[in-house]
Amino acid sequence: MKRIIMILGIAGLLSACTSGEKKVQNEDFKYLVDEFADLKVMRYQIPEWENLTLQQKEYIYYLGEAAKCGRDILADQNFKYNLTVRKTLEAILNSYKGDKKCSDYQNFVVYAKRVFFSNGIHHHYAEDKMFPEISQEYFASLVKNSDAKQLPLAEGETVDAFLDFITPVIFDKDLYAMRRSGEEDIIQNSCVNFYKGSINKGEVEAFYDAQRKPNDAQPISYGLNSKLVKENGKLHEDVYKVDGLYGKAIEQIIYWLKKANEVAENDSQRNYTNLLIDYYTTGCLKKWDEYNIAWVQDSISTIDFVNGFIEDYNDPMGMKATWEAIVDFKDLEATKRSEIISANAQWFEDNSPVDPRFKKKECKGVSAKGIIVTTLAGDCFPAPPIGINLPNADWIRKDYGSKSVTITNLMDAYDKAANESPKSVLAEFAYSQEEIDLCKKYSSIADVLHTDLHECLGHGSGQLLPTTQPGSLKEYSSALEEARADLFGLYYCADPKMVELGILPNMECYKAQYTDFIRNGLMSQLARIELGKNITEAHMQDRALISWWCYEKGLKDNVIERKVRDGKTYFVINDYEKLRGLFGDLLAEIQRVKSEGDYEEGKRLVETYAVKIDLDLHKEVKARYDALGLKPYGGFINPDIVPVVKGGKVVDYQVNYPCDFLNQHLDYGKNYSFVEENHDAPEHLVVDMLYDFIDGTLACGNAENAVHEVVKYINAHPEERVIYITDYHPANHSSFADFGGIWPVHCVQGTRGGAIHEAFYTDVINPANRPDPERNIFRKGAKVDEEQYSGFESVGPDGRMLSECVGKDLVISGIATEYCVKNTLMEFLNAGHNIELLVPGLGYVDKKGHDETMKELEKIVTVIE
């Protein structure tokens, strides 16, 4: 979903409609209902609900249920342990028996609400990990004093063992620090759950490059609806479909889509919904394209919806899509403005400052409307876009057109909620009263126009060269695409055509949008980012790129001037016409970058202008914003649509407006949880890290370094259960040379040589991951006549063999590569396990033998370098 996000700093200036009579709503309705951390929670109304027919209401109700059934998918996509964390929080909130009035518990509630808001443990916008302002000890007491039956425990797992796993996931500041990272290898340093196994960026590119067809005029969206998995060195996709990943949730979505189809308004809706069901059933991306083609050609229906894996913003590679849904119906009043714009799409395309090679010769099927949303879900909830343009496939947009919408009731809710706050970002960051007056007079009109231009025409403008593959800009594609659409809107806001078409009242109007945009891009949006952090979110990068590029290019002519008054920084536009020219120049360049697939120039633009933040300016903005007492981010509670039953028959559907954010999410957790939580972290088998193999009778190469590397890995993955496999030989063991074997005496029971290296006791941070003979030490070779290189049948403290005690996914390290490590690995591999081999954590008897063994193993398992 090419989308535009509300900027809360100017929300008080916006209105849902720019002309005409306001739709009937409850004038006493309270919009702002909760504030915590850096967030505010609002409600939105559904005007004109009573004007819908019973059939239309029923259709919306079923579509809304389909939307809510996919809720868990997004949380799981955002991070593999999000559902485990969320269900733990839900269990505490629903069953904790202790004091709920103390400050610690209230701080816990704030954390829980933040996790619900962000659909996971990472901030929904900044993407860094959030932490509860409570101690680990207090958290443990919350868990232990809650109903264990409600906790997401694995079969046979104790509460204490579960705490060993979940505590570092929540509290460790270095573990899973960023949902989507731009540092070094963007796959390995990101926590999004689109990739599993030790996969790097190059492997992802090679996997999908091998699938793409050269000069394909109608390419599918490769990788859009799947997780890329590396198992035993081989890559494959787990596809999201009925009999695949997220199958249970998808079954529920399909159930409600079928119910909706029974009461659809027309055959067009039934047709594209059936195609969507086929796509969900098969996972076939050609079916996805067929659905989008049918969907985009329906511009007549009153009711519409989006339901699927749509946007790739969260994927570091810009390929894999998060799940989202909205349900809506047409706002007839607001649609008039949008229809004027879409009717003139060809004029805008022909007159843009873009190279003619990159312009569409014919703009097809451009439709635009204002909509009233009734249900938000997935990546649109609780923090939704205010504008949408779909579908995303460039060839479908070129050949069949696109749908663009402005969500009018959400814009109205943002506006009304901002008016309930006493202070204004505008008054703080605008340089003059003249600027304030200009924005108060025209921002509501200009911003809605910019949103329409951005969504209706901006994303749909231009074309790729025939030789350019979609997705060529990779991790920079989202920021550059949003910048391209914003620039299109900014350039045309100032065109006299807007007044000629009757959309703007005069040529002063656009100046309000220019000042708002530059002020936000250079300054006010920085209030949303933690000090010292970079800009990572695509829309924020887009605004920063445009603003700082124009500031730099306009320095010679003083187009945008940086002023300081009373110790406060301001940015003032001195020449609006020249600024429009700069917008046009940058639009032309970014269109060229996209059309030609110029990755290096796209990278340069984003990295130069859209990532780094001036620390002094950042500190100033944060201090000024904090003094206002406003929250920089906002989201919503959904209305509840409830059947009204009389005489056993549904006679109406009533809209209720709940005001408790926490309760809504707890209710959703009880009624719409269809994805199993995952806390089956890989188990780490540490083989024979014993003194005799390190500095004793059988001292091995790289052994000391291997100990250091294994400890480092364990500390970087504290949630992974560690199992220590050890030789445990009697003094007369048959493997010893004195008793007919080939080895010197080693690892004898009760000797230093048979002890695990002390670093695993002293340097491993998580106590649960240290060696403990009562818990995680498995012994082999304990019988006189048993060689037993492999740990597969090593015996644990409860008498069971290791093969009976571990899950499918294993990490293996230890000594020695050619013998005990290889034999352990091969037995588990042959038993169907997925193996990752920690290469730096290996010691060896002979370097040549190690190298030969690694050549063999690299072909059959995944290696961690």
Each PLM stretch: what is its role?
Residues 110-229, 236-435, 443:
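Contiguous, non-catalytic segments that form substrate-binding/exosite surfaces or channel walls
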Residues 579-678:
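Extended, compositionally biased alpha-helical segments that mediate assembly or anchoring
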Residues 53, 266, 478-495, 707-714:
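An active-site-proximal "capping" alpha-helix that borders the catalytic cofactor pocket
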Residues 53, 266, 449-463, 485:
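Active-site recognition of the HExxH zinc-binding catalytic motif
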Residues 45, 490-593:
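Long, well-structured alpha-helical subdomains associated
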Residues 462-483:
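Post-HEXXH active-site segment of zinc metalloproteases
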Residues 14-16:
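C-terminal motif of bacterial Sec signal peptides marking the signal peptidase cleavage site
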Residues 677-779, 808, 833-836, 845-858, ...:
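Active-site acidic carboxylates
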